[in-house]
Regions:
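Helix-to-loop junction immediately C-terminal to a conserved catalytic motif
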Residues: 50
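Conserved ABC ATPase signature
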Residues: 133-137, 141
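The feature captures the beta-strand-to-loop junction immediately N-terminal to the Walker
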Residues: 35-37
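Conserved ABC ATPase "signature" region
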Residues: 96, 111-129
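Conserved ABC transporter NBD signature motif
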Residues: 58-72
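Catalytic Walker B motif of ABC-type/P-loop ATPase nucleotide-binding domains
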Residues: 158-162
Length: 256
């Protein structure tokens, strides 16, 4: 079992909903990509799942148990977009903060905590940067560090808000590959917000296209992301290209 969301609706004002009746199911090891136009409510929806914003109606179930939000579940890691760091913490310091819930307010990190933090950095391929000062790091390095901090929490559910934003194409590809690897290896339910349908095609098992009112489209990636749906939801003309003829088990899109 995994995560089930039923009928989630939200609005900042009464009788004026930003989105309504969002449903999806996500099994362990699966990745769900959430897409939609700017301002449609993708980030707000993630905040509703996390309990940062309070949804107006709907239900959330984790492994068959109803929860009011995913923070209540306790085994969910959330990586927000555009995280800014104004203090000279090292990468290791930041990843250890992911252990705060288990360490306690007045306790110091144990040897095991530090070992787990270094292991998470190693899984992200940045163990050699453990003493790197965050204010001196690149956007790609910081994104990997935040993933390590999420991973050290040993989450069952991982929520990432535009993890590939502000990265060049190579780093976008590397981040997405790591997310896929983590979801499969650690059996994590993973949700990513993205603006790019091609990135969803590359990484996601399922897609949720958020539209106005209840005009949402949810299902397997290849069934949901079609030339017609991309035109409808993004107002662009696109060509879907299957890469199997090139020996690659993947497909992508180009705008035309």
């Amino acid at each position: 079992m995994g995560l089930v969301v039923k009928g989630i609706s939200f609005g900042y004002e009464r009788n004026k909903e930003l989105f309504k009746d969002i449903d999806f199911e996500l099994n362990k090891s699966e990745i769900l990509a959430i897409l939609g136009r700017n301002g449609i409510g993708k980030t707000t929806f993630l905040k509703c799942l996390m309990g940062i914003n309070k949804y107006n109606k709907g239900e959330i179930f984790v492994d068959g148990h109803k929860v009011s939000n995913l923070q209540e579940h306790g085994k969910t890691a959330y990586v927000a977009q555009n995280n800014k760091i104004n203090f000279p913490y090292t990468f290791l310091d930041m990843v250890l903060m992911g252990r705060a819930r288990d360490i306690g307010i007045f306790s110091l990190p144990s040897k095991k905590d530090k070992k787990d933090a270094m292991k998470a950095l190693e899984q992200m391929g940045i163990a050699h940067l453990h003493n790197k000062i965050c204010t001196q790091a690149s956007g790609g390095q910081l994104q990997l560090m935040y993933l390590a901090r999420a991973l050290v929490q040993k989450p069952e559910i991982l929520i990432l808000d535009e993890p590939e934003s502000f990265l060049d194409l190579k780093n976008q590809s590397e981040i997405l590959k790591l997310i896929v690897k983590l979801a499969k290896k650690e059996k994590i339910c993973c949700i990513i917000n993205t603006h790019n349908p091609a990135n969803a095609m590359k990484a996601a098992d399922k897609v949720l296209l958020i539209g106005k009112d209840s005009n949402h489209n949810y299902g397997k990636t290849k069934e949901v992301l079609t030339e017609e749906s991309i035109s409808t939801y993004f107002n662009i003309n696109a060509k879907i290209i299957d890469l199997e003829s090139y020996g690659i088990s993947q497909y992508t899109m180009v705008e035309i």
